Design a protein with these regions (language model features):
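A short, flexible loop at the N-terminus of ABC-type nucleotide-binding domains that lies
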Residues: 1-23, 107
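ABC ATPase nucleotide-binding domain signature region
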Residues: 30-35, 39, 45-99
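Catalytic Walker B motif of ABC-type/P-loop ATPase nucleotide-binding domains
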Residues: 139-143
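Conserved ABC ATPase signature
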Residues: 114-122
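ABC ATPase nucleotide-binding domain "signature" region
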Residues: 35, 124-131
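Interfacial catalytic loop of ABC nucleotide-binding domains
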Residues: 99, 106, 111-114
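A short, proline-enriched helix->beta-strand linker immediately N-terminal to the Walker B motif
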Residues: 130-138
């Protein structure tokens, strides 16, 4: 069992007087599957970015796991989809990608098209397939 520990987390954006988080404490067991629910603009994405170390904050965030984040930012969308997926999960074998594609009901031929030619739904499923193969990381899925 691994834990994500948050203690005394306080955060606001530069130039803002409004705190997004103030002295927040909690633990998350990485075996849990949980969702953050709230109205727009309430700090869900900000929290995920704090976990990923994207912003400076006060307090402590400790984790013994690495994080993977979705949506994954693809640098070169003109590459073949298979090449994009190999960058995300370089340790995975092609047969594992085929299996994930089958589970997500994506046609295998999608792998051999440029990523930019895929529909939004196909891009989402392809990226998730690769991220699901990175088994030792904790998935942060944002909208």
């Amino acid at each position: 069992m691994s834990l994500i520990n948050v203690a005394g987390l306080t955060f606001s954006y530069d130039g803002s007087f409004d705190l997004i988080f103030e002295d927040v404490d909690f633990q998350i067991d990485t075996d849990w599957k949980l969702g953050l629910i709230g109205r727009n603009g309430r700090g869900k994405t900000t929290f995920l970015n704090l976990l990923r170390g994207r912003y400076e904050y006060k307090g402590v965030i400790k984790s013994s796991v690495c994080f993977d984040y979705f949506p994954y930012d693809v640098d070169d969308k003109d590459k073949y989809t298979i090449d994009v997926l190999r960058e995300i999960a370089p340790e995975c074998m092609d047969w594992e990608l085929y299996r994930e594609f089958a589970l997500l009901k994506i046609d295998e031929e999608v792998m051999y098209r440029s990523f930019s030619s895929l529909s939004g739904g196909e891009q989402t499923k392809a990226l998730l397939a690769a991220l699901f193969l990175k088994q030792n990381n904790f998935m942060l899925i944002d909208e």
